[in-house]
Amino acid sequence: AGLRSLCAVMERKTGRGLSTLAGGGAAGGLGAGMVAFLGAELRRGIDAVLDTVGFDEALQQADFVFTGEGRMDAQSVRGKVISGVAARAAAAGVPVIAVVGDAAPGAELLLDAGLCSVFSINRRPLPFEQVRGESDVNLRFAMKNIARLIAAARGSR
């Protein structure tokens, strides 16, 4: 209720429509305040990062994009790094392979959001706390298998 009241006051004072501003309520309304009083433009964080590192230019020479996340689930579709990477790469026609610690229910939603495939590095059905110490070995094993799959699909070994 407090943020709504503040938003209404800011809208009256500035004449700007802020109540429907995507991302305006994040960080206690900081985004809306910056738009209202400083004329700022809000952007998704992943878009700012990908633009800064020249992601679109790098895609022009890429055969694949690999991305990762500790746990991929339905929430991963809504604004997480992996969904931003998948959307940009898919728009450029570059397949995206996600390598994750845990592919939880809902992870399949990213397959409709630009992701080509998802591989979990966990080789045993154990809680994270028990397999944490094996993550480096499991990641190497998963990446070796993915590389072999790509090589086999291309007709080489």
Residue ranges with predicted function:
Residues 1-157:
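N-terminal loops that bind phosphate or other acidic moieties
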